[in-house]
Amino acid sequence: MPKTCTYYLAPQSPYAYLGHARLLAAARQHGVQIELRPADFGKIFNASGGLPLAKRAPQRQAYRLLELKRWSEYLGMALNLQPKFFPVSGDPAAKLLIATQLAHGTDAALNLAGDIMRALWVEEKNIGDGETLAALASAAGHDGKSLVKASETASVLGEFDRFTDEAVAANVFGAPWYVIDGEGYWGQDRLDFLERAFAKQE
């Protein structure tokens, strides 16, 4: 039975963007299968006492920008600290990823997730806009308009709710969040620890 890592994703998270490619590379290296779970982090914050960015204290908002600058420079990754279309709801993108996963598999959804996050944090695109999402999906080789339409179907909405409920039950409170062997790891800055857990399973 393949080793699995559950990946709770908020597509609008800059830290998910910074960690996404490294997560996929580590999973490939260690033969770990990623279970992608795009979720409603508004509901998760409500359940866990978290605050959306706009409601956080100014000190926390300022330090967040400093940390993002440090990490983007350290990793050598382009990142616009204050993109034009942020804050933005990640729900439309999350549901598109679920629709992609159902239609084309997890690898396709993971690849599209990377494209969506880069679109927000590097390319100044509005990932809350259906036409933008359709164009990104089409650029990835899919029928973007059909996937956006599918993202509002009952099956996708049901999965979105299920993933969110699972996250709350698993004590998730931030994104990105990774789970392996029932143990949670919050944030891309925990990827070293996560990779150690991957290696222990070999």
Segments (PLM) and residue ranges:
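Structural alpha/beta surface segment adjacent to cysteine/selenocysteine redox centers
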Residues: 11, 17-120
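C-terminal cap of thioredoxin/glutaredoxin-like
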Residues: 4-6, 12-32, 111, 115-202
